Each structure stands twice: as C-alpha cells, then as structure tokens.
Amino acid sequence: MKKNFTSIAFALCLSIAASAQTTTINIQGAPRKVPAAVAARLQKAADATASTGIDFSKIQRWAGSGDCQAALAIKWAEGQNEGKTLVWGYRWNSSETKTGEDLIRAVVKADPALYMMATNDTWGYYIGGFGYDADGDRYVTLTTMTDEIYPRNGIFDIPSSEFPTSASTRYGDGDAWNTPEGYNYWGYFTADNAADALRYSMIGTSSRTLTDGCVDAYLFSTDDGSNVFDGNLEYLPATTDFTTGTFLLNEGSYGHGNADVNYLSADGTWTYRNTTEIGATGCFAAAWGNRYYIMAKQAKDGGADKTGGRITICDANSMRIIKQIADIGDNGGDGRSFCGIDEHRAYVGTTTGIYELDLDNMEISKTVLTTKNTNIEFGNMARLGDYVYACEYGKNLHVIRCADNTLVKTIPADAYSITMSKDGQLWVSTATGISRVNTSKLELEPVSLGEGIDAPANSAGMWNPDGLCASLQNNVIYWTSSANWMTQKVFRYDIDKASASLLLDYTSDPDSRNIYGAAFRVDPKTDCLYANLVKGWTYTDNVVRKYAADGTLLAEYPLQQAYWFPEVFVFPDTEDPVVADIDDVKADEGQTVNIDLTSCATDADNFQAAIVKSVEKVGDESVATACVQNGMLAVTGVKAGTTTVTVKFCSNGISTTKDINVTVANPTDINGTVGNAGAREVARYAADGSRIQQPQPGLNIVKYSDGSVRKIVVR
C-alpha cells in the first residue's frame, strides 16, 4: 500500500496557500518560486510507485568499496534511454560519513558514460544537467555561452546562471541529455530503504547523509508531468576496470579512420575501441597524473568522420576524453611524444619543436626548443634530475633544464630513442648500437655489444617510439631489431654483467609473425614482456604474446581481425610514491647541510631515479633556506631557531610531501681562537673550505690537535 505520509510531508514543506498561484519550494535544497502546478507534478512523480523497486543484488555497475551500500537512480524525460530509469550502486565504509554529493560524484567519476553539469552555490551542490553516453564513444563536450568545455571526472563545473544556455554537444545517437528550461528541472528524491516509496527531498544532495541500503534518485520534471518513476528499471552492466591490464594504442588505418585504443584485462579479455576518434595515426601514449596523454600525428584522418586531436587527454579511471588539442604550437607540427615534468607541466615533441603543455589548463603554454634542421622529429624524451634529455630523431640529443626551459647542451649523435634503467642511468639507441649517457660530462659513451648483436631498429622515416625499453625489476634494457619495418628480433642487455644476448627470434616463426612498429614493452610491476605480432603482411591478423623475463611464452591473446596497426603498449599507473622518514636536520648559522634524497622515495611502478624532488615550502625562511638540485637537498642555516622544510616527491605526475624538521644553532661567538681543553689549534678554514692563517670575520672552522673540529664565528 502506498504510504500517505509522503503526501502529507510534501504538503507541509510547501510554502503555499491553497488558492495561491505561485509557491516557493526547495529544488535540490535551493528555494525557488514556481507555479503551484509544478509543485503538484513533483508529488505525482513520487507517488507513481509504492516502493523504489530496486534490488541491490541486481546492481552491477558500482563505484567505491566498503560494507555499506546505496543505490542511484536517474530518469531522463522525453523517452530518452527508452524511458527507463538507470540504476547504479555506491559503496563506502561504515566508519565514514557520506553524503548524497559523495555518491553522485563517485558514480559519475567511475562511469565513463555518465556525466553531469553542476555547481556549488549558497545552498550546496546543485545539479543542472545529467547526460548519458549511450553509444559509448566517450566523446562529450558542453557548449556554454562563451566556450566548448570538457568534463573533469565526468563533471562540467559551471555557474548555475549558465545552466539554461548550455547544451551537451558532440554526442551520438541514443545519448541522453536534460537541462533546466523554464520550470523543467532535475528533482531530487530519496528513500531510506529500497522497499520504501521515494520522497521528494527538501534538502540538497550536500546535506543528505547516506544510510546503508538507501536510495537517491533524480528525475527530470516536464511541463505535462508525464515523466514519473514507474518501476521500469535498467541495471547497467559492470564497467571495465582499467587498472589491472594493459592498453594498446593503435595507429588506425591511414586514410580510413582515426586512431583508437584497445584494452587487455588481466584475465585476457579484450575491450575494443574503448577510446576512439583520437586523431590520425596514434603514435605515443603515457600515464601521468591520473590521466593518459595520447599523441597523434594529426588531428583528423582523411577518412574519419570526426576531428580528434594531436593531443588527447583521457581520465585514467574511465578513459573518458577530457580534452583534445588539435594544433600544437604556432607552426602546427605533427604530434610525436610526451614527457611529464611535474604535476603541472609536460613537454610534447612534434615535427617542429618541443612545446610546454600546461597540465592544469590543458593547453600549450610555451615553445621550449626549435632547430634550423629540416625534416626534424622530436621523439622520445626522459627526465632525470633537473634535466630532460630529448632525442631529435636520428640527429641530436638535447639537454634541457626544466626549471626555465633552457637548452643546456646539444650532443651530436644519431639518437633515435632513450630510456632509463633501474639503476637510474640513461641509454640511447643509435644507428650503430647502444650508448650510455654520461650525465656528468653530458656525453654519449658507446657500449660494446659483442658479435651477433644487432643495432636497434628505427622507424626509417615513419616515426614511432621504437622498441627500446627497460625493466623496473631488473637492471636490464631491451630493444627490437630488424632489417625492415617489421621487427623480427628482441635483444637483451644485462647492465650489471655488461652482457648482451638474443632473447626472442621471429625469423623462423611458423606463422611468419613479426612485431609491428614499437609494440614491444615491459610491464613495470610483473616484469612480463608484451609483444604484438602481426601475421605476414596481412596487417589484420594480430596476436599479443606475453613472455616471462627469460623469454618463456606465458600466454597468447588474439585480437579481432581488423586493420589495427598496433603502435605501443601503455601500462596503468596504479601506485603512488611512498616516502620514508627523513632524519631531522641540524645546522649552524651559515652552514649548509646536504641530504641525498635519491633513495628516500619509491614507487612500485616507476624508476626511483625518475621521481622528481623539489622544495614545496620552508616554514620560516628567516631561520633556514632550502633547495633541491639533481636530487640533493641543501639546507642552509640563516639564524638560530627551528623551522620545517616540506619536500615534494612527484612520480608519474602524482605528488606526495614529507616534512623535515630543521634546527639552526648559533655557533660559539668569539673574537679570537678558543681551544679545547688540553688541545691546540692546528688548522683554520674559511666557510668556503679555503685555508686561512689567522681569524677572519664570519664563520671559521678550526681543527685541534686532539682531532676535534669546531665552528666559530669571529666578529
């Protein structure tokens, strides 16, 4: 039986007399003046069913984790989504207090198909529009009065004044979208239990405290009141977990369509084209700061229906496209590569130069480097310490200081690709072999590979990232080699043993399979090797083979037959940097204490040497100053006192901090030499370490005959 208290409670909440023409009601907690008929149709929507009808056991699309659960139900108007109410689930721990805002944010972030237009105003979090990407192309933008914007974690955050003039755009057939117009808006309904009837909520989602087994629902009201909760529910299937497998970026079929991305789960299941319309000829991808940055040579293939971007930025959890950048720099160079600098900046390589990408605003901000060379391609790059080492494909290795984007040195070399090894060294592939980068002298040192070891393959005018890569678990690098475009051999170089060997040989493969492009990489966490192999010159018959580090075949994963042209594997970044405790620093006035930060931080899916260290702040700079140079923290005492130095560690675009306590002492204040009891002065030095013959004003370092050393200040 329908519960009458729902109607009574609703009536009491209306600031209305029976004969009034308008009334004030709360819409998602915000008071609004509406015609009395609008208030009546809200009650009609809530009274349509005696219970929510939701069965938690049927929910498959979940967000969050924990021992408590809630359901989310959304119904669009005008028959969208075939008139069904879509259902999601949300979990959290009973030790936590969660609100309706937490629920909706988590679900929208987790589901790449769901997005919303919302804002924070005086009355809390207010939702102006919901959309659902039914065709699954994950290609959604919002057109406002002034701009076309992309969602962040599924949310378009704009002022509520722009709600009526904003519209979801660039979505396909079957997609759903409703936004306020006139007196049509999204109503908020709740139930404490799935067996209860939904009640119109007089409070907003920010004020709603969730309880185990509750239901939050949103319904778009219409002028005729026809849109009601009618029990026609659709339990959405589970979404793909993009954190446990590997991505395979495809070039796409040139002249026929844009690039796309396939995903191989840990259990060997393929999800095809989970991100599409990237751009023409996908060529590079990197995980950085909970996003994927995918490079394409051009923004649109001649045979594609949609324009993508030379840079496509995707959310790492959902592979939802956040933004696409069609052109890179004023010269419009073709996209090539990406190298993260910190959580705010990155470099992108093109056919005209290297440019700085502002990661916060997702736009090209500066030109870093261009050259007078013709037919240039700025390809693979690696950051180590304060510098980025960038390959000008087949020509030079450029060393760039990240702090000010200054070119420090150009090393003449036929450099093709670069990688970092477990021990923190950099290795460059050249036309004749492998070279180690001497980062102290900024020189290349060729490595003797021995007989029968081929030089790395290069892409011979059709750029790809090449097969040079390194293990995170062992001090080993790998490269692919071949006399033509198809790679037939994989070589391994053990750095500790200074020994190279042939690991994989496809010259006698029974199916005549070869590695296409740069589709060979090492999983940083498992140390397994992944290679995409195409059969002969058909290009449509592809299989991914997974090997142990010693070359033992572990599994094969055939792909659907298509002109994929797989380019490169990309592994999810699922681990954050972890920082060990750092000892307190004690310094005298004028003294500099150096702390090596190299081994202070670790990351289970990144090289230790690749973790960027910097000083975030000094609590009191009148007590001490601090800076980091090439991973070395220098703390200098200024005056006696205590302060804190906060050091930031950035790994794969994710940062964490560690506070270091600093105590600065006042050295012995004397006007001449004061010796230790029974000891005599044998040497005296200035603060810069130079030997002096007599006391001089400032900090003096005095060594005594008993071996002790004292720092004194001479005034």
Kindly label every feature range from the protein language model.
Residues Q21-T240:
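Ubiquitin-like/PB1-type beta-grasp interaction modules and other compact soluble beta-rich domains
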Residues G255-N262, G302-T312, G353-E356, K395-V399, ...:
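Structural motif
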Residues S265-D267, D315-M319, D358-M362, R401-N405, ...:
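Short loop/turn segments that connect beta-strands within beta-propeller blades
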Residues D267-E277, R320-G329, E363-K372, N405-I411, ...:
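A short beta-strand motif characteristic of beta-propeller blades
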Residues I278-G289, D330-E343, N373-G385, P412-D423, ...:
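Repeated scaffold domains used in trafficking and secretory/extracellular systems
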Residues K535-E575:
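Blade-level signature of beta-propeller repeat domains, shared across WD40, Kelch, NHL, RCC1
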Residues L633, K639-G653:
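A short beta-strand micro-motif common to beta-rich folds, especially ectodomain repeats
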Residues A665-R715:
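C-terminal outer-membrane/trafficking sorting elements
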